[in-house]
Amino acid sequence: MIKFITQFLFVGFIALGANAWADDTVRDAAISAVVTDQIDAFSKDDSERAFSHASPMVKASIRSHERFLTMVKNAYGMIYRPSSHELQEVRMIEDKLYQVVLFIDQDRNRFKIFYQMQKQANGEWKINGVTTFTAKNDVFA
């Protein structure tokens, strides 16, 4: 009987772990889709679509999709018109989720961008800001 209970608990823990992994996979795919769509929107100068992925805090501070596009053009050229980009992992840092993306700009400079993601009450993921790092040693596949 004890062996059965132990096996039952073991199988239950494995199932819980598999469910958590599956939930993370679904979450990460949703986050990646948001970031990818915003990058695509920038490539087409679709400021409304790009701005639609911004969190309420970002929208409140910038106030319009036109201003948002201008800000990205001027401050984040590597995101606005990258030579290439590659989505990396989704990371949890201090209870916040980040989509990591490697970018190469038009001058061949490399950047690692951390997109801070924020889950909304309706379940959608929004971008709550980015943090940029120079990524001299990162290699693109």
Regions found by a protein language model. Name each.
Residues 1-2:
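N-terminal secretory signal peptides that target proteins for export/translocation
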Residues 7-17:
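Bacterial N-terminal signal peptides
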Residues 11, 20, 39, 57:
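Generic anion/oxyanion-binding catalytic loop in active/binding sites
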Residues 20-32:
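Cleaved targeting-peptide boundary
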Residues 29-33, 37, 47-95:
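Short solvent-exposed beta->alpha transition segments
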Residues 89-141:
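Exposed beta-sheet edge and beta->alpha loop/turn motif
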